[in-house]
Regions:
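Bacterial Sec-dependent N-terminal signal peptides
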Residues: 1-9
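Short, Lys/Arg- and Gly-enriched loop/turn segments at beta-strand edges
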Residues: 63-76, 159-167
Length: 169
């Protein structure tokens, strides 16, 4: 049964969230968003996502009308119904894009890049997930990112904030 919040229709519903996020080409920049097979949720207020877990959530879905970026709903977490760790064999595909914006911005304090090097083989991607690059892929990875070219890779989960590249598509 819908409820109304400040004249806008809100619905309480149960949704699933996949154990990974994906790179979305947003209006003026790229970002990581949730993958939900049964909702349009890309971000959920008050939800603390960890990589490598399937989630079932109870959320409030607030209809806000069509925004310029295509967004129609806002989501806020009411309850985590379940949080299930993936098996060690799960592999997922993700696009890695080294550029945050479609055109480089020359403004001070703006980071044009999505990758920050943490050590010789680990990078922080979009300030959200650490990516381990095994030695056999480092040359390919550096060539692509130095030339500001994205690539698709297959990844495994290491822990709630780290993934490992296992193959290149």
């Amino acid at each position: 049964m819908p409820i109304f919040v400040f004249g806008q229709q809100a619905v309480v519903k149960k949704i699933k969230i996949e154990p990974y996020m994906y790179t979305q080409n947003y209006e003026h920049f790229k970002r990581l968003v949730f993958e939900s097979p049964d909702s349009e949720a890309e971000y959920i207020d008050r939800f603390n996502f960890e990589w490598g877990y399937y989630y079932t959530l109870r959320v409030k879905e607030l209809e806000i009308g069509q925004l310029s970026d295509g967004t129609r709903y806002e989501y806020s977490l009411l309850k985590v119904i379940s949080k299930e760790k993936v098996s060690d064999t799960v592999i997922f595909r993700m696009f890695i894009d080294p550029l945050r914006y479609y055109h480089k911005l020359e403004e001070e304090g703006i980071s044009n890049y999505t990758l920050s090097q943490l050590n010789d083989s680990t990078y922080l991607y979009m300030d959200k997930v650490e990516i381990e690059i095994p030695h056999k892929f480092l040359e390919y990875f550096r060539k692509k990112t130095n030339n500001e070219i994205g690539f698709i890779g297959n990844f495994k989960f290491v822990n709630g904030k780290r993934i490992r590249l296992v193959s290149i598509r």
